[in-house]
Amino acid sequence: MNSLAPVITIDGPSGSGKGTVAGLLARELGWKLLDSGALYRLLAFNASNHGVDLTNEELLTKLAAHLDVQFIAAEPGKLQQIILEGEDVSNVIRTETVGAGASMVASLPAVRDALLVRQREFRDVPGLIADGRDMGTVVFPDAPLKVFLTASAEERARRRYLQLKGKGEDVSLSSLLDEIRARDERDTQRAVAPLKPAADAIQLDSTELSIEQVLQRIRSEIAQRDLA
């Protein structure tokens, strides 16, 4: 960790495009990448691999503090790589089983505290792009550039629908919209680190913007701050 390394935080709700933007930006700048949303899945997956019960807060906290993980920004149009203990786990951590485990470990306060420390350890030269829901408000409140990326629930549901259909999955647009609205409510109303823009965040609505247009807006903010 290098506490002097610059950080650009990209927060926002599910389906806003923050993960895609963060990955492309990290690759473009040659900076480190943190996909904070994947950490709970990684912890649940790692715990299962090591035979640790998902209710054992003490052992989970130790695992969280020493997660050996690396995020590799992908080329345009491809998924980022997530390397855990030297193994590419990009696809296996996206299963429903791992997702359910992630929800269990995320409810444990000591685990959340340990992962907060672990997230801050990703800060290193030449810089870090941190993608999540509370990067600018909780994890890196001193970041020189904070972006809050959003889009209408309808547009986010449409994007998810096209993504899943492209994988051959049989999905309903209306059910996806219901899921996104329900998740938005949970994320914004939760007691710990609710989803909200930092007071000094640049807010971007990507509903009618392409990924390249969003990137161009962020590049402009980077140039104004002389960050890269």
Swiss-Prot record:
This is Cytidylate kinase. SUPFAM superfamilies: P-loop containing nucleoside triphosphate hydrolases. The keyword Membrane does not apply. GO terms for cellular component: cytosol. Coiled coil: none annotated. Its EC number is 2.7.4.25. GO terms for biological process: nucleobase-containing small molecule interconversion; pyrimidine nucleotide metabolic process. It comes from Pseudomonas putida (strain GB-1).
